[in-house]
Each structure stands twice: as C-alpha cells, then as structure tokens.
Regions:
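Short linear capping/connector segments at secondary-structure termini
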Residues: 1, 31-36, 226-231
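N-terminal alpha-helical segment of soluble enzymes
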Residues: 1-2, 203
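Rossmann-like NAD(P) dinucleotide-binding subdomain of oxidoreductase/dehydrogenase enzymes
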Residues: 6, 10-177
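Alpha-helix N-cap/helix-start motif at coil-to-helix transitions, marked by capping-box chemistry
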Residues: 10, 83-86, 206, 210, ...
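Short glycine-rich loop/turn motifs
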Residues: 39, 47, 268-270, 288-291
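ALDH superfamily catalytic-core signature
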Residues: 95-102, 121-123, 127, 134-277, ...
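C-terminal lobe/hinge of AMP-binding adenylation domains
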Residues: 283-286
C-alpha cells in the first residue's frame, strides 16, 4: 500500500544515514600502543568486490542497505535484486550515481537463481550479503565452499523465522490487537519481521480473540494504490497459490478471514487457531496469523 511504500523510503534513508555514521566512527585510523616507542596505526581497507543479493519484499530499503554498507567500508558491489523487483533496484542505483557514487562502484545483474550461482561462483567476489529464505542461504553457503582452492568468502545472511508474541493477563488488550494487526497483516504479511504466532494466556484468550476479530472486520483488502485500502496483494502467482493451498489445508481451524471483494492475488488476512505448536514448522509468508493459548504459571 502507499503507507507501506512511504515507510520503506524512510527506512532506506535511515539505512544510508546509519551506515554513513558508522563509517565516520568505525573507519577512522586507530593508533595502537607502541611498547618500544614506535607509532602503530590500524587502518581498515575494503576487501574488494561484494555480491549483494536482495529480497523482493523490501526491494528498496534492504537493497540500498546492503549496497551502502559495502560501499562505506571501501568495497565495490555487484548487486542482484530479486527477479520480481529489478526496476526498483535500477532506479535506486540511478539516484545513487546522481548523488555522486562512482558509476563503476556499483553494478547490477538481473535474473533468477541461475544468475546468482554464476555471480557467487566468480572468484573475484570476496564477500556476500544475502537476505531471503533459510534454504537459499544454506545453498549459497555450500556454493561458496564448493571450490577447494578458493579462499573462504564471508557470508552475511539474514533469513526467515517464526516471529511470536507472548501475551499475558497484564497486557492491555487494545494495544495487543493493534500490534497484531499491524505486524501480522501490514504489507500482506510479507515481512521477515511479521507476526506469525500469537500466544495468549488462557485467561484472556477468548476476550482478546474477540477483539482481534472485531479489528480484522475493519480491514479493507484491495488495490494498494487506493489509500482507503489497508491490505494489498501478495507478490506473485506462486506465492498466492502456496498460501491459498495452506489455507485450504487448515480450513477447519480458521477463526476468521477478511472478505476479499475483488479478483487478483489477494490472500484474505486470516486468523488460524492452533492446537499444537508442532503443527507450525515453517514460515507462511503472507497475511496469516496463528493463535494458540498457554495456561498461567507455565
């Protein structure tokens, strides 16, 4: 939606400012003790060419954060945006060059996983930063270790997980509901920080779920270009099919789902009751929040 997009622009600016500030402080020469009277100075230098592999769900903020971190530490970057969002990356690099970043310091390669494999297999790449799924991160790690004659290549990987919220009887229900709706359903739940599992103390569970369902009834699903809408579509057909198949699988445990009045890749924001945490063994990257209860004192 438009608010999500504006928030991402602000986050991208924050990333650039943060790494610029860290560079001013951390990249300064450090004078070391000289026990025999000599002057010793520690200076940091860039390693060389870094490969930056960015996700589609924050195609501006995370992409620029990866690039900025590499540049301010004296490196050059070959950046591969997600195949779903190459234009956003290209526009952002155009802006970076207009702002004064040397054209040769950043290059973009577009494509899917096959392009990523070629990039990571190039011995000129001395470091890799990646944001995405755990299986892909493991595949990248194996790729970087496949060449026995290649020096070890650092890998910085930010991957997925199951974000949980524990709520006990001291919590303010209104605040809980607000946070669940924002974290679980904003950006159609397509954030690595999105809430996946809501754990409620049994004594307050019924009341909290009732309030949450009431808040979900106020959500409007539709065209993200319309500021009156709260929830937009998921990224592509594959994501839509995967999420809808899962919803069908747990249909008997759906507590509430937001109506979707239009056609398209719109997954209904959904609240699913869970009997066992063992039933949730993977991250469902969409507007689906699972709820379970726990007894006081445990």
């Amino acid at each position: 939606t438009i608010p999500d997009a504006l928030a991402e622009v602000r986050e991208a600016i924050d990333f650039c400012r943060y790494y610029a500030a860290r560079a001013r402080e951390d990249m300064q020469p450090v004078e070391l003790p000289g026990p025999t009277g000599e002057r010793n100075v520690l200076r940091y230098e860039g390693r060389g060419v870094w490969a930056a592999i960015a996700p589609w769900n924050f195609p501006l903020a995370i992409f620029l954060g990866q690039v900025a971190a590499a540049l301010v530490t004296g490196n050059t970057v070959v950046a591969k945006p997600a195949p779903q969002t190459p234009d956003i990356a290209r526009y952002s690099i155009d802006l970076a060059r207009k702002a004064g970043i040397p054209a040769g310091a950043i290059q973009i390669v577009a494509g899917g996983g096959d392009i990523g494999q070629v990039l990571l297999g190039d011995r000129r790449v001395v470091g890799t930063v990646f944001t995405g799924s755990v299986p892909t991160a493991k595949a990248i790690a194996r790729n970087l270790l496949a060449d026995d004659d290649r020096p070890l290549v650092p890998l910085i990987a930010e991957t997925g997980g199951l974000n949980a919220m524990f709520v006990d009887s001291t919590a303010l229900s209104e605040q809980v509901v607000r946070d669940v709706v924002i974290s679980g359903f904003q950006s159609a739940g397509q954030r690595c920080s999105a809430l996946r599992l809501l754990l409620l103390q049994e004594e307050i569970a019924e009341h909290t779920i009732e309030m949450l369902v009431g808040a979900m009834k106020e959500l409007v699903v539709g065209d993200p270009a319309n500021p009156a809408n709260d929830i937009g579509p998921v990224i592509d057909q594959a994501a839509y099919d995967r999420l809808m198949a899962y919803r069908q699988k747990v249909a008997d445990r759906i507590v509430f789902e937001v109506p979707v009045p239009i056609d398209g890749l719109y997954v209904p924001p959904t609240l699913v009751r869970m009997d066992s945490l063992d039933d949730l063994n993977t991250e469902w990257f969409g507007p689906i929040v699972h709820v379970a209860t726990w007894p006081a004192g445990k």
